[in-house]
Design a protein with these regions (language model features):
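ATP-dependent helicase/translocase motor core
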Residues: 1-173
Length: 173
């Protein structure tokens, strides 16, 4: 739905017609509304939950971000937070394209349904040719900043969603 849109059928008198409603305007990024929400309360199956950060495009939660202190391993964000959110508030992942887990020193991204082994670091901001300085990233706690600047800029995020997210429909490749 995010890439191709939704077909809406209308019937006027005896004539049936349809239109495609685009949920995201990939051709004109400025036509979309981007909203970042910090610690929004969401009613879950058993109680209220509060993800650290959600990024919405046109009201759809497309990016989930779980943040930890630098002393907490990123893997804990996956096992203690993301897995429980998936069970208790699964609706926030209906349109999710990216899950980010970070402690400032290490930042990983993956699909909401992926195992932790499929969450990977995002280290570059502008170019694949950039040299990675892991020491500087660790000293300045910039791994999450690199991801924000490198992936979550409006134009880049839309490009990533439109062109680099694989939608598994259960068919073999």
């Amino acid at each position: 739905y995010l890439r191709e849109g939704i077909q809406i059928t209308t019937r006027i008198k005896d004539k049936e017609d349809f239109d495609i409603v685009r949920l995201i305007d990939f051709d004109h990024p400025e036509q979309n509304t981007f909203t970042v929400v910090n610690q929004m309360w969401i009613k879950g199956h058993y109680n209220y939950r509060r993800p650290d950060v959600l990024l919405f495009i046109n009201g759809l939660p497309v990016v989930f971000i779980e943040l930890k202190k630098a002393t907490v391993k990123v893997e804990e964000a996956y096992h203690k937070n993301l897995l429980s959110y998936r069970k208790d508030i699964p609706n926030i992942f209906a349109f999710n394209q990216i899950c980010v887990l970070s402690n400032g020193l290490e930042t990983r991204l993956g699909a909401w349904s992926a195992s932790y082994d499929y969450f990977f670091e995002w280290l570059k901001v502008d170019s694949e040719k950039e040299k990675i300085n892991r020491k500087a990233i660790a000293e300045h706690d910039t791994s999450v900043i690199n991801l924000i600047d490198g992936l979550l800029r409006k134009d880049r995020l839309l490009d990533y969603i439109e062109n680099f997210v694989f939608f598994d429909r259960g068919n073999k490749i």
